[in-house]
């Protein structure tokens, strides 16, 4: 869980940032930790798109998409909304920093 990957940037585009989705190998542990810190998170995509009923039979080729299936198990949405104050952003960042500091002392 020592590594979190944030949203990427694509040249010459702007992101609306309605979701702030990160990747983490130990997503469920991270989510539990943040909940204990009073920080809500969400798993907006509990299954890969090609596995959802609405897309059944609509995907050409193999119905197994390794990278997609691997990724959806690792993504977690952190708080992101217009009313989120700078103090709340700082609280989320501090909780993540606390987690990484705790982990680094255990190694």
Describe every region a protein language model picked out.
Residues 1-107:
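PLP-dependent aminotransferase class I/II
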